[in-house]
Amino acid sequence: MVKETTYYDVLGVKPNATQEELKKAYRKLALKYHPDKNPNEGEKFKQISQAYEVLSDAKKRELYDKGGEQAIKEGGAGGGFGSPMDIFDMFFGGGGRMQRERRGKNVVHQLTVTLEDLYNGATRKLALQKNVICDKCEGRGGKKGAVECCPNCRGTGMQIRIHQIGPGMVQQIQSVCMECQGHGERISPKDRCKSCNGRKIVREKKILEVHIDKGMKDGQKITFHGEGDQEPGLEPGDIIIVLDQKDHAVFTRRGEDLFMCMDIQLVEALCGFQKPISTLDNRTIVITSHPGQIVKHGDIKCVLNEGMPIYRRPYEKGRLIIEFKVNFPENGFLSPDKLSLLEKLLPERKEVEETDEMDQVELVDFDPNQERRRHYNGEAYEDDEHHPRGGVQCQTS
């Protein structure tokens, strides 16, 4: 039992969620609420990052489950939180802060794919907008020699203000220079490039061909190196495509295996059957259970080499795993005569010799709501004992 569920609620998972479920939840939410896509959701993005940072670490998660957020803040597992952007970059393969200072920003896109796409391979065209260096001014922002050091911040891009907070006590506040917007330089409006308006970069449409190889997995990343946003003086970042697999109506993927449930009738479980299965590459395979091979309810069997192709070894495949659900006939489906005949065909049942010490009881259908109602009525009864309800009482003389 966990002390509180706030972090689990933020990620939209249950307290018993696996690491894979946590990763999938963080991936979807981080991409949805990233400041580049939702500038007004900075606090939400921070909450998502903090929740994942704690729950993805086994020691921090154990501490949180026992003591809640307060236990994390008190520093029992390292204390404090990392930068939300650093967590995002490390998760999506973008490196940390130092790497970002040398390179332009990576751009992350989520691409929805089907299980068929991952089985057969596919090619998708993705249209996106990216920053490229303005070719009119060659990334200068204006005429040659027009760029000058910002006199307001002296080229640092930051302003420092001293604020007195009490007698003999001052506070130093650092903020982005409003004159140059943190660039450390400025260009006179008359000298600015007409194409980029002094920003040095322009937006450009880019069409990417995304090749999805056979056997790729949900959450796998496809990286286009150097295709991210460009900035003067920096190496371009990457475009990272994250695959997001939709649920399939029949199959569930488990590593390299495919899992499915199959309903069969009692006669099929006892006497054998043949069942067709439509595969993800539009073939039809037929599975056979021969007469005399009893299939029990809940039995799990597999077909070799009919699972998912193995990534980069597409001629090798995992297993198709099938769990059988045996459907029994309804009450009264046989007449007494036929039931007697069926009994003779089946293995002999064991008879019970009744004694006087035995009691006959009736077997009835189970009602899962019965215990809930009994529990509710019991609470109401106890409440009446401790807090009698108002009403008419007998008078005593």
From Swiss-Prot:
Residues bearing the modification N6-acetyllysine: 66
Binding site for Zn(2+) 2: 150, 153, 177, 180
Zn-finger segments (CR-type): 121-205
Chain residues carrying a lipid of type S-farnesyl cysteine: 394
Span of domain J: 6-68
Subcellular localization: Membrane; Cytoplasm; Microsome; Mitochondrion
Binding site for Zn(2+) 1: 134, 137, 193, 196
One annotated GO molecular function: ATPase activator activity
Positions annotated as propeptide: 395-397
InterPro entries (alphabetical): DnaJ, DnaJ_C, DnaJ_domain, DnaJ_domain_CS, DNJA1/2-like, HSP40/DnaJ_pept-bd, HSP_DnaJ_Cys-rich_dom, HSP_DnaJ_Cys-rich_dom_sf
CDD domains associated with the record: DnaJ, DnaJ_C, DnaJ_zf
Modified residues (Phosphotyrosine): 381
SUPFAM superfamilies: Chaperone J-domain, DnaJ/Hsp40 cysteine-rich domain, HSP40/DnaJ peptide-binding domain
Biased composition (Acidic residues): 353-365
Recorded superkingdom: Eukaryota
UniProt repeat feature CXXCXGXG motif, residue ranges: 134-141, 150-157, 177-184, 193-200
Main location, first listed in the record: membrane
Record-listed Cysteine methyl ester modification sites: 394
Topological category with respect to the lipid bilayer: Lipid-anchor
One cellular component (GO) term of this entry: membrane
Region Disordered, annotated ranges: 352-397
Transmembrane segments annotated in the record for this chain: none
Protein keywords: Acetylation, Chaperone, Cytoplasm, Endoplasmic reticulum, Lipoprotein, Membrane, Metal-binding, Methylation, Microsome, Mitochondrion, Nucleus, Phosphoprotein, Prenylation, Repeat, Zinc, Zinc-finger
Function as written in the Swiss-Prot or TrEMBL entry: Co-chaperone for HSPA8/Hsc70. Plays a role in protein transport into mitochondria via its role as co-chaperone. Functions as co-chaperone for HSPA1B and negatively regulates the translocation of BAX from the cytosol to mitochondria in response to cellular stress, thereby protecting cells against apoptosis. Stimulates ATP hydrolysis, but not the folding of unfolded proteins mediated by HSPA1A (in vitro). Promotes apoptosis in response to cellular stress mediated by exposure to anisomycin or UV.
Subunit structure: Identified in a complex with HSPA1B and BAX. Interacts with RNF207.
Protein known as: DnaJ homolog subfamily A member 1
Source organism per UniProt: Bos taurus
Gene name of this polypeptide: DNAJA1
